[in-house]
UniProtKB/Swiss-Prot annotation:
One of its GO terms (biological process) is cell differentiation. One of its GO terms (molecular function) is sequence-specific double-stranded DNA binding. The gene is ELK3. GO terms for cellular component: chromatin; mitochondrion; nucleoplasm; nucleus. Belongs to the ETS family. PROSITE patterns: ETS_DOMAIN_1, ETS_DOMAIN_2, ETS_DOMAIN_3. May be a negative regulator of transcription, but can activate transcription when coexpressed with Ras, Src or Mos. Forms a ternary complex with the serum response factor and the ETS and SRF motifs of the Fos serum response element. It is found in: Nucleus. The modification Phosphoserine is found at S115, S396. A motif (CTBP-binding motif) lies at residues 273-277. Pfam families: Ets. This is ETS domain-containing protein Elk-3. Keywords: Activator, DNA-binding, Isopeptide bond, Nucleus, Phosphoprotein, Repressor, Transcription, Transcription regulation, Ubl conjugation. There is a cross-link at K92, K165 (Glycyl lysine isopeptide (Lys-Gly) (interchain with G-Cter in SUMO2)).
């Protein structure tokens, strides 16, 4: 016998051979057979396959392989009884073709017998089986759950974030408005009264530079309002003493030579030129009389007392001096009755008593004589000579104040 024979072929040969009727026999005409001596049949199968330890248990497990191939099946309720499924066709078929084409033949027969509804149900069953296997694969842990979550639920999370970002700007908008109001307040659009800081310096040279800086640091906006009024200044007015203690005849020691500066802030709509004189103050006759302000409304800075005998030059960028970026700028000019304080937006172009000035040799720091002519650089319409009388005398303090009161 051939060694390449299969188990079902081996059993079929035993049934067809009359010598082995005491081991295996047919029980019916439809292909049922019974193993009369199952252990002997198993030993014969072991001899064919060169397996000496073959027994019925191993033989029965080998027969189960043909259950799936639908070649042999076990008869239920009968021990050692089996049946060939396609009998007697199996006797006429090629043994090699039986195992290869048996499964395909069974599928074709089932398709022919099944109705169209059954076919559709079979297809749906296959689709459900595929989806079930996919879900089992996803939840088995072999597939990353992070990737599944990121693919299934990202749009909702992004929408929530976008709505939160759209709701946040209205809540933050009030602080932005508050910052804008602060900026408007700094630019003095709504503030009517501004107090000017006052700096006290020990030497006369620093005092001269400080007074010049304070006199020249006024904003261009206030100066533009005061330019029309500056043209209507007259030069005839009587002198009147403002303070008895500051009269030119009052003697003072040399170390107490001082310059008193009194600055009062006015509204931007009611500003007018100021007259300055040594020890006296007058009001221009061309200007209408102005009522005296109450004491509660007067905002004046403490006087700046500057002592010394020598008037020199000082750098305007000293940290002791106030910044002039947001302060008005006034300029002094000579009138027959005294010194007139006129506005001028020359904050960054005027050089006071510096070596860069074209009239530096004529500065009071180098010419100490009385009635020294001192010229500033080009002003509104030309050069304005300003005499500074009695700078070297001991009893000639100057009081600079606003014309808020009548002389």
């Amino acid at each position: 016998m051939e060694s390449a024979i299969t188990l079902w072929q081996f059993l079929l040969q035993l049934l067809l051979d009359q010598k082995h009727e005491h081991l295996i026999c047919w029980t019916s005409n439809d292909g049922e057979f019974k193993l009369l001596k199952a252990e002997e049949v198993a030993k014969l199968w072991g001899l064919r396959k060169n397996k000496t330890n073959m027994n019925y248990d191993k033989l029965s497990r080998a027969l189960r392989y043909y259950y799936d191939k639908n070649i042999i099946k076990k008869v239920i309720g009968q021990k050692f009884v089996y049946k060939f499924v396609s009998f007697p066709e199996i006797l006429k078929m090629d043994p090699h073709a039986v195992e290869i084409s048996r499964e395909s033949l069974l599928l074709q027969d089932s398709d022919c017998k099944a109705s169209p509804e059954g076919r559709e149900a079979h297809k749906h069953g296959l689709a459900a089986l595929r989806s079930t296997s996919r879900n089992e694969y996803i939840h088995s842990g072999l597939y990353s759950s992070f990737t599944i979550n990121s693919l299934q639920n990202p749009p909702d999370a992004f929408k929530a974030i976008k709505t939160e970002k759209l709701e946040e700007p209205p809540e933050d908008s009030p602080p932005v408005e508050e910052v804008r109001t602060v900026i408007r307040f700094v630019t003095n659009k709504t503030d009517k009264h501004v107090t000017r800081p006052v700096v006290s310096l020990p030497s006369t040279s620093e005092a001269a530079a400080a007074s010049a800086f304070l006199a020249s640091s006024v904003s261009a906006k206030i100066s533009s309002l005061m330019l029309p009024n500056a043209a209507s200044i007259s030069s005839a007015s009587p002198f009147s003493s403002r303070s008895p203690s500051l009269s030119p005849n009052s003697p003072l020691p040399s170390e107490h030579r001082s310059l008193f500066l009194e600055a009062a802030c006015h509204d931007s709509d009611s500003l007018e030129p100021l007259n300055l004189s040594s020890g006296s103050k007058t009001k221009s006759p061309s200007l209408p009389p102005k009522a005296k302000k109450p004491k509660g409304l007067e905002i004046s800075a403490p006087p700046l007392v500057l002592s010394g005998t020598d008037i020199g030059s000082i750098a305007l960028n000293s940290p002791a001096l106030p910044s002039g970026s947001l302060t008005p700028a006034f300029f002094t000019a000579q009138t027959p009755n005294g010194l007139l304080l006129t506005p001028s937006p020359l904050l960054s172009s005027i050089h006071f008593w510096s070596s860069l000035s074209p009239v530096a040799p004529l500065s009071p720091a180098r010419l100490q004589g009385p009635s020294t002519l001192f010229q500033f650089p080009t002003l509104l319409n030309g050069h304005m000579p300003v005499p500074i009388p009695s700078l070297d005398r001991a009893a000639s303090p100057v009081l600079l104040s606003s014309n808020s009161q009548k002389s």
